[in-house]
């Protein structure tokens, strides 16, 4: 049965969530203090502002949270602690408001909608940001969601809330950029060449593409097996992606790829050859310099101690 989203929690749709580095550092510190080396997750409150569909997350704080691993419906979040912390943060910066909550997931869980409903009492349309504190691949370790109402086509069943994914990005003010650069100063390796950086970036992009393709394949397999309902909207998006793929059977395109690959291999070969010649040249110079030092040491007069 087809499902159509007909009503959202707020009149304005969230288009993007911007997370600041201070928030990421605070969440990682929270995880390391509470749930490191365990399967538990940590939960906290996100502070910031929202304007024209963009949620700007500038600060956060942790809240006590417990849940039953066997029964997801059993969980506890300390309301009093949250309200006390928010009042203290409000004194420091009155412009920051509750915009949602965070979790170290690393994926959505069954009781997330219940926790999300709790934050509806503090903000009309809260966002959920899941932070992967132990990412397996490079990239942005954040995923953001907001809730919408969903009803069946025949309207015989009650509407239910579901999460909708929204794009995220990492951004910082000038002061934050200076602090982040200071923290990463000892991490950066200045000896890495630009070519190596570009190759690493392309490799990361290919790994990300491979992961997305695997997710698509897994989703389609679940739909075929009947474990997930058929969603025409997702299939339309997939069809649009496949329609954008180029026809790789064209002779001109195959020839162009071959020429491009041969040119790149030639550049790599010449680079390796030049690097070897330079290394050999430096080795010869080092040998000659050592011989000159040895000759200079041998030509020095040896001091003979005077006899009494």
Curated annotation (Swiss-Prot):
Tissue: Ubiquitous with highest expression in flowers.
GO biological process terms held by the UniProt record: innate immune response; leaf morphogenesis
Keywords: Acetylation, Immunity, Innate immunity, Proteasome
UniProt cross-references to SMART domains, sorted A to Z: JAB_MPN (SM00232)
GO MF terms, alphabetically ordered: metallopeptidase activity
Keyword Zinc found: no
Modified residues (N-acetylmethionine): 1
GO cellular component terms listed in the entry, alphabetical order: plasma membrane; proteasome complex; proteasome regulatory particle
UniProt cross-references to Pfam families, sorted A to Z: JAB (PF01398), MitMem_reg (PF13012)
Domain MPN: start-end pairs: 17-154
PROSITE patterns recorded: MPN
Loss of function: phenotype: Slightly dwarfish, with long and narrow rosette leaves. Exhibits a delayed flowering time. Mutant displays enhanced susceptibility to the fungal pathogen G.cichoracearum.
Subunit structure: Component of the 19S regulatory particle (RP/PA700) lid subcomplex of the 26S proteasome. The 26S proteasome is composed of a core protease (CP), known as the 20S proteasome, capped at one or both ends by the 19S regulatory particle (RP/PA700). The RP/PA700 complex is composed of at least 17 different subunits in two subcomplexes, the base and the lid, which form the portions proximal and distal to the 20S proteolytic core, respectively.
Family under the similarity heading: Belongs to the peptidase M67A family.
Biological role: Acts as a regulatory subunit of the 26S proteasome which is involved in the ATP-dependent degradation of ubiquitinated proteins. Required for innate immunity.
Name of protein: 26S proteasome non-ATPase regulatory subunit 7 homolog A
């Amino acid at each position: 049965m087809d499902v159509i989203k007909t009503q959202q929690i707020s009149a304005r749709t969230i288009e993007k969530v911007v997370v600041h580095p201070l928030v990421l550092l605070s969440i990682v510190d929270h995880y390391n203090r509470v749930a490191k080396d365990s399967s538990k997750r940590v939960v906290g409150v996100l502070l910031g502002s929202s304007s024209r569909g963009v949620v700007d997350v500038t600060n956060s704080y942790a809240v006590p949270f417990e849940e039953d691993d066997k029964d997801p419906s059993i969980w506890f979040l300390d309301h009093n602690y949250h309200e006390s912390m928010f009042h203290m943060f409000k004194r420091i910066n009155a412009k920051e408001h509750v915009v949602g909550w965070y979790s170290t997931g690393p994926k959505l869980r069954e009781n997330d909608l219940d926790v999300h409903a709790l934050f509806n009492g503090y903000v009309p349309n809260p966002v959920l940001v899941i932070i992967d504190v132990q990412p397996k691949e490079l990239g942005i370790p954040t995923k953001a969601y907001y809730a919408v109402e969903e009803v069946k086509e025949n309207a015989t069943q009650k509407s239910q809330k579901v999460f909708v994914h929204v794009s995220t990005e990492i951004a910082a003010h000038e002061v934050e950029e200076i602090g982040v650069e200071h923290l990463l100063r000892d991490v950066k390796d200045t000896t890495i060449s630009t070519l190596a950086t570009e190759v690493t970036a392309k490799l990361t992009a290919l790994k990300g593409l491979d992961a997305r393709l695997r997710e698509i394949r897994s989703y389609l397999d679940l739909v075929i097996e009947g474990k997930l309902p058929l969603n025409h909207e997702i299939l339309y998006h997939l069809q649009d992606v496949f329609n954008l793929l180029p026809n790789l059977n064209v002779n001109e395109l195959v020839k162009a790829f071959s020429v491009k690959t041969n040119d790149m291999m030639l550049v790599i070969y010449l680079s390796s050859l030049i690097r070897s010649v330079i290394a050999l040249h430096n080795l010869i110079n080092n040998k000659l310099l050592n011989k000159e030092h040895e000759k200079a040491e041998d030509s020095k007069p040896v001091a003979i101690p005077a006899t009494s």
